[in-house]
Amino acid sequence: MSIRLENLSYTPGARKEKHRKGRGHAAGKGKQAGRGQSGQKKRSTVRLGFEGGQNPWFRRVPKRGFRNFNKKEYEIFNLSDLESRYQDGDTVSLESLYLKKVLKKRNLKAKLLANGDLTKKLTVTTNAFSIAAQKKIEEKGGKIEVR
């Protein structure tokens, strides 16, 4: 007899039939279906955070605060940073602030605050600024532009 596709068969014991649990005694895994005695864990798993009927942690601890998803994040820099890194008459942009390592992230918005003194005339382009910082820059003849 020659070997042909219709003659091929598996070696005995190579393929096992799937046991369908909980489908009656005749199926081989009926009644308790390998789950042991009756009880809570036989039914299904207990839900996440369940502590056996004790008042769970997330209900014992009081609620507090929330996370504002509309919050505007600014990277802050001060007039003292500008004083030490720029010459009189320079233009200060967000890109130049990043290149001079004043800002840590290139694409984050930046806000200028009035900490420190300024002795130079500068043109500053930024996303936001404090009124005190604007006043100090304009006193020295500089100007502020909002980007």
UniProtKB/Swiss-Prot annotation:
Coiled coil: none annotated. Keywords: Ribonucleoprotein, Ribosomal protein, RNA-binding, rRNA-binding. InterPro entries: Ribosomal_uL15, Ribosomal_uL15/eL18, Ribosomal_uL15/eL18_sf, Ribosomal_uL15_bac-type, Ribosomal_uL15_CS. Binds to the 23S rRNA. Residues 1-46 are annotated as: Disordered. Belongs to the universal ribosomal protein uL15 family. One of its GO terms (biological process) is translation. It comes from Mesomycoplasma hyopneumoniae (strain 232) (Mycoplasma hyopneumoniae). GO terms for cellular component: cytosolic large ribosomal subunit. This is Large ribosomal subunit protein uL15. Part of the 50S ribosomal subunit. GO terms for molecular function: rRNA binding; structural constituent of ribosome. Residues 16-28 have a biased composition (Basic residues).
